[in-house]
Each structure stands twice: as structure tokens, then as C-alpha cells.
Amino acid sequence: MKKHLLALAVLALAAGGAFAQANDTIAKAKASGVITQGVRDSSGALAFTLGDGKYTGFHYEVCQHIIANIEKAIGKKLDVKYQLVTSQNRIPLVQNGTVDIECGSTTNNATRQKDVTFINTVYVEEVRIAVKANSGITSIAQLNGKSVATTTGTTSVQLLRKNERATGVDFKEVFGKDHADSFLLLESGRADAFVMDGQILAGNISTAKNPADFKIVGEVLSVEPIAIMIRKDDPAFKKLGDDTVAAMVKSGEMAKLYDKWFMQPIPPKNAKVGLPASDATKAAWANLNDKPAEDYAKK
């Protein structure tokens, strides 16, 4: 009996160790020599594809700095693999270990914090409305009876419905499978408006065939922290990520990176997003934190 109990105890310890290892991304990377970065194909200047399996963007580059610091910590180069994620599957893929660090356009909110952890915020977004310039739409009230596009798995339409100015406004929701698809709904006339993060709207407009045909209008629906996502219960990786972004802010590298991606011409069309750092983003740099969107709403 004692031997049986001892065997069970050993198995329990082994299982606990395996669980800890699964959530220790740095140890996992050291053992395997591989780290998998979750990427997006059309998340505005934060993260997008260049084609041929290549990705780039503001959050993509921040993640590259974090990965470089993992390599320094473990003393060897890593094979960085890229996993394309969507708004629907990004959280499950981080949870199940397919993706080690997700570098896209994910809102840090209280619900998601139950499932994943976020690196301290370095980009704060304003959710806005994009329309065709000749639509005559300038406010939420004018969306009554209209079709409004958003991307499956995002929170934007819920924010629109919760806005006090939307009381009594009845609109139809249409969904794109990704942000580019949602913008296409607007561009093709299948939607009268596209509700999404301002930089995603601005980025899609800047690369449209005729950017002047579109504009961003109306009230700011919400202010949301957009952050890099990792697995829960991984304090070593959380600290390394937070330390990395803190060093980038302190050195001025973060501000330079922001200017590069939001104020200068960027690939693939050499177009400029033209979105200066908001006061909320500057405040996040001045006081780095991982507070959820709900805390921003209280202000």
C-alpha cells in the first residue's frame, strides 16, 4: 500500500512538473530551441502580412525585441516560427500552447484576463466608425436602419450598442472573417459603416484604391488597451516581457517605433497611416501597466 501511495505521489509530482513546464515559455523555448509567435494578416500597422510568410508591424517588432531578450536569457538563438491567428482562435491557440506569444491587436479586458496574461500596454486604441465619404453619415444616430460591419470575434459592435448615443438606433450587423474582409464589406457597399479600432480603420483606408473615398467619423466609442498576449501563470515570461517594453520606453525606442509605423510611409503600398500617438498611449508609456479596458472606462 505504501509503495502504491508513493508511486501515486511521484506521478502527481511529475504531472505538476509537466504543467509548470508547459506554462514556462522560457524553459520550453530553451528545451526545444523554438518559439512560436502569433501573427495577424491585416491588423493595421500593429501587425500585418507582407506575403510569402513574412509579417511585420508595430506589435510584431515589439515581440521581436521580447524574443531577442529570451535568446539572451537562455544563451542561444531560437527558431522563430509564425502562426497566423484570427480574432476567433487567438486565445485558444495561446492557451493550448500552439502560440507562445501573440502579437496582434488584442484588447486586454477583464474577461480575457481570466484565460490569458497580457504584457504591459504600449498602445491604447480608440474605437471609431469608418464610412464612405459621400455617405452623409457623421454620427452614431445616423446608423439607424443601416448595415454595420465588424470582424468576427471582436468587441466593437457590442461597444457601439452599449454607447448611450446608440439608444433607439437599430442597425444590422454584418461580419467579416478578418479586418480586410470587414473593410471590403464597406468598400463594396454591402455595409454602410465599419466599426473597429481607429488604427485598423486608418490603415485599411490608407491602402484602399481610393483613400479619399472613406473617412472616420462620429464619437469615440471606447478607449481600449491593446496588448501582447501570453499564457497565464507564467511569471518569468511576464516579467521578461514587461522589462523589455520598459527598457524600450526608457531608451526612446518605443516612441521611434511608433513614429515608424504610424507616422511614416509603410509597406506594402508605401502609404502613411497618419495617426499620432494619443494622450492615452503616451500616458500608458509614462505609467506602464496591464490594466484591463474596464479600468479605462471608469475614467
Put a short name on every predicted segment.
Residues 22-102:
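Extracytoplasmic small-molecule ligand-binding "clamshell" domains
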Residues 36-45, 55-72, 107, 124-179, ...:
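Bilobed "Venus flytrap"/periplasmic-binding protein-like clamshell domains
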Residues 41, 123-131, 206-245, 264-287:
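Periplasmic-binding protein-like
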Residues 61-69, 141, 146-147, 152-154, ...:
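Extended ligand-binding regions for polar small-molecule ligands
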Residues 74-86, 169-178, 218:
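Short beta-strand-to-loop elements that line the ligand-binding cleft
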Residues 75-142, 283-291:
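Acidic, polar ligand-binding/catalytic clefts
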Residues 89, 104-114, 159-166, 185-188, ...:
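A ligand-binding cleft/hinge motif common to bilobed small-molecule-binding domains
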Residues 158-174, 212-214, 246-299:
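Ligand-binding clefts/hinges and TM-proximal coupling segments of bilobed small-molecule sensing domains
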